[in-house]
């Protein structure tokens, strides 16, 4: 099976890395085209477009200016180790063993507004460009129009290489909307993580994001072969809830966190 996750806004280009066989992003020509579009915008325009502070807008304008090919280990960092949000706290790439890292390179993909689809060991230079950004570009009015079928076709290629017809969706709606289910050669399985709050089970964003990372880690370490194997996930107190689940949506519940 192939799993997809969202990227993170926060980045880590400081911490130590293990020895890794890094790779190049496969849609770099597209990324370069988008960087050129973003370079035409002033920091103020970027700030307005992305709804970020002047300080962050200045930082990201500078990142687009400094972005350059070729990528190497001095100017870029493997994607799985560069993102630093709640999903990546759950994934905890720094503690994965070499076998799990190898599995990740085959079975985990990171969706990206700038790079399209990243493998975990693909080098990336720092950026901020969320998939939902309404960026005018040569192919349309937003990034969904820009990427079109390209992301889905790349996932199809990865699924074919795995000999798999199952895609595990661990991404947010914003990012997974860049995947075209009608073009995808796979069944989509979406794990949902619910936490108890005042006697009700509901999705709490902070916990759910971390749980998606934990599920990605489970896939890399346990190598589930089937959807039923995914139901064995029990990290951090979550357990599969048959009654709330359906064929395509696996619901995991957890008692209230005290």
From Swiss-Prot:
Listed InterPro entries:
YaaA
Single biological process term from Gene Ontology? response to hydroperoxide
Lineage: superkingdom? Bacteria
Which Gene Ontology cellular-component terms appear in the entry? cytosol
Concerning HAMAP family, the annotation shows: UPF0246
Record's NCBIfam families?
Answer: PRK02101.1-1, PRK02101.1-3
Similarity comment text for this entry: Belongs to the UPF0246 family.
- Report what the protein is called: UPF0246 protein IL2146
């Amino acid at each position: 099976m192939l799993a997809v996750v969202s990227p993170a806004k926060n980045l880590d280009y400081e911490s130590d890395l293990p020895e890794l066989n890094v790779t190049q992003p496969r849609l770099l020509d597209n990324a370069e085209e988008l960087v050129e579009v973003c370079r035409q915008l002033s920091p103020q325009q970027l700030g307005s477009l992305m709804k970020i502070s002047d300080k962050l807008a200045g930082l990201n304008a500078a990142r687009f200016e400094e972005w350059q090919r070729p990528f190497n280990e001095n100017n870029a960092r493997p994607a799985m180790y560069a993102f630093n949000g709640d999903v990546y706290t759950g994934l905890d790439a720094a503690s994965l063993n070499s076998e799990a890292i190898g599995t990740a390179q085959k079975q985990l993909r990171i969706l990206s507004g700038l790079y399209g689809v990243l493998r975990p060991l693909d080098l990336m230079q720092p950026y901020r460009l969320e998939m939902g950004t309404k960026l005018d570009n040569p192919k349309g009015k937003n990034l969904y129009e820009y990427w079109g079928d390209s992301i889905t076709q790349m996932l199809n290629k990865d699924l074919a290489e795995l000999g798999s017809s199952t895609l595990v969706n661990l991404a947010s709606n914003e990012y997974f909307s860049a995947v075209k289910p009608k073009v995808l050669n796979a069944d989509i399985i979406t794990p949902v993580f619910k936490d108890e709050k005042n006697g009700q089970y509901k999705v709490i964003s902070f916990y759910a994001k971390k749980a998606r990372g934990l599920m990605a880690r489970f896939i890399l370490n346990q190598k589930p072969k089937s959807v039923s194997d995914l139901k064995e996930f029990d990290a951090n107190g979550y357990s599969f809830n048959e009654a709330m689940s359906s064929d395509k949506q696996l619901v995991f519940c957890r008692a209230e966190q005290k």
